[in-house]
Amino acid sequence: MKTPIELKILDSRIGSEFPLPAYATLGSAGMDLRAMIDTTMTIAPGETQLIPTGIAIHVADPGLAAVLLPRSGLGHKHGIVLGNLVGLIDSDYQGPLMVSCWNRSDIPFTLEIGDRLAQLVFVPVVQAQFKLVDEFDSSDRGEGGFGHSGTK
């Protein structure tokens, strides 16, 4: 069963020239988001640009959130990743989805109209309530931090 999420089309090219976000395969975890820009755009090395996706969503269910993740091929082949590394969309957000695109390579990257540039994934959310304590119950790890458990 799929959870219904409200989607608003902000760019009329979505649904006509370019498809609505959808799962590519039965096993896909994310839906591709597209660059709904007006003209071809070049992102210079080291530059970050905010790219519209042409849609807005309203998750509504506080037990869910959406995350924006980079597409692996863009990062590996072209050095294009998300400027904020991961985008978190809270269940009560209703504004346009924008993708912060960072060119971490040393060559310019050309983004064409409608290019797929990020993935939208829905994840469960647990809202925690803190319980104040003076001490923690002991654990095997304790305060061991970065690199504490080794590499092998």
From Swiss-Prot:
One GO BP: dUMP biosynthetic process
EC number: 3.6.1.23
Role summary: This enzyme is involved in nucleotide metabolism: it produces dUMP, the immediate precursor of thymidine nucleotides and it decreases the intracellular concentration of dUTP so that uracil cannot be incorporated into DNA.
InterPro entries reported for this sequence: dUTPase (IPR008181), dUTPase-like (IPR029054), dUTPase-like_sf (IPR036157), dUTPase_trimeric (IPR033704)
Catalytic activity: dUTP + H2O = dUMP + diphosphate + H(+)
Gene Ontology MF term list: dUTP diphosphatase activity; magnesium ion binding
Protein name: Deoxyuridine 5'-triphosphate nucleotidohydrolase
Pathway participation: Pyrimidine metabolism; dUMP biosynthesis; dUMP from dCTP (dUTP route): step 2/2
One Pfam family of this chain: dUTPase
Cofactor: Mg(2+)
Enzyme class: hydrolase
Native organism taxonomy: Bacteria, Pseudomonadati, Pseudomonadota, Gammaproteobacteria, Alteromonadales
Protein residues bound to substrate: 71-73, 84, 88-90, 98
Repressor listed as a keyword: no
Record keywords, A-Z: Hydrolase, Magnesium, Metal-binding, Nucleotide metabolism
Organism: Shewanella sp. (strain MR-7)
Family indicated by similarity: Belongs to the dUTPase family.
